[in-house]
């Protein structure tokens, strides 16, 4: 279990840090569940389970999704729901990448005006 909001004394787990850094969240930010967008995301779900074998490093952004407890339990139990989670998460990742590209373009235009 990876809590997104943490007591200051606790160290972020690697996969939580990867997720938080990519989406530019701070430790105190309210992070909504990527699926239901109703509850606070308290878990970072590995879309491809670490227990499924293959690469031992499953802590890359395409494989990490912020979910509330209910959605996380459902994703763990229901392979079809987990597939929908993968699709939704990849949409969110693509949107974030697009936003970063647009931000960089805007900053370059601003810098060129100087």
Residue ranges and their predicted role:
Residues 1-41, 52, 81-114:
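A boundary/linker detector
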Residues 17, 47-48, 74:
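Compositionally biased, intrinsically disordered low-complexity segments enriched
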Residues 48-65:
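Short linker/helix segments within small regulatory modules
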Residues 41-42, 68:
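A composition/secondary-structure signal for short, hydrophobic, low-basic-content segments
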Residues 42-44, 77:
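Short, non-ligating residues that shape and space the ligands of small metal-coordination modules
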Residues 44-45, 71:
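Single, functionally critical "micro-switch" positions that shape active/binding sites
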